Amino acid sequence: MNFNRLFILVLVAVLVVLGQQQCGVEAAPRWKFGKKLEKVGKNVFNAAKKALPVVAGYKALG
């Protein structure tokens, strides 16, 4: 059997097993990581939005 076919077969089997798991109301761990990452990105965006006018004003003075 070709290695590529074996790899694809194993990959499909893993995806089927992971796709059938249900965690009820609680989010799956992979989605929790995504939510945490999204929250970090939102915090960085908000901090940059607040800090950039201050930095621009400081550079204009100096």
UniProtKB/Swiss-Prot annotation:
GO process annotations (BP): antibacterial humoral response; defense response to Gram-negative bacterium; defense response to Gram-positive bacterium; innate immune response
Membrane spanning stretches: none
Keyword Cytoplasm: no
Keywords for this protein: Antibiotic, Antimicrobial, Immunity, Innate immunity, Secreted, Signal
UniProt subcellular location: Secreted
Pfam families named among the record's database cross-references: Cecropin
InterPro entries: Cecropin, Cecropin_insect
Highest taxon of the lineage: Eukaryota
Function summary: Putative antimicrobial peptide. Partially neutralizes lipopolysaccharides (LPS). Exhibits anti-inflammatory properties: inhibits LPS-induced iNOS/NOS2 transcription, nitric oxide (NO) and pro-inflammatory cytokine production in mouse macrophages and human peripheral blood mononuclear cells (PBMCs); inhibits LPS-induced activation of MAPK and NF-kappa-B signaling pathways in mouse macrophages.
Note: Protects mice against Escherichia coli and Pseudomonas aeruginosa infection.
PANTHER family: CECROPIN-A1-RELATED
Protein name: Cecropin-N
Lineage, uppermost ranks: Eukaryota, Metazoa, Ecdysozoa, Arthropoda, Hexapoda
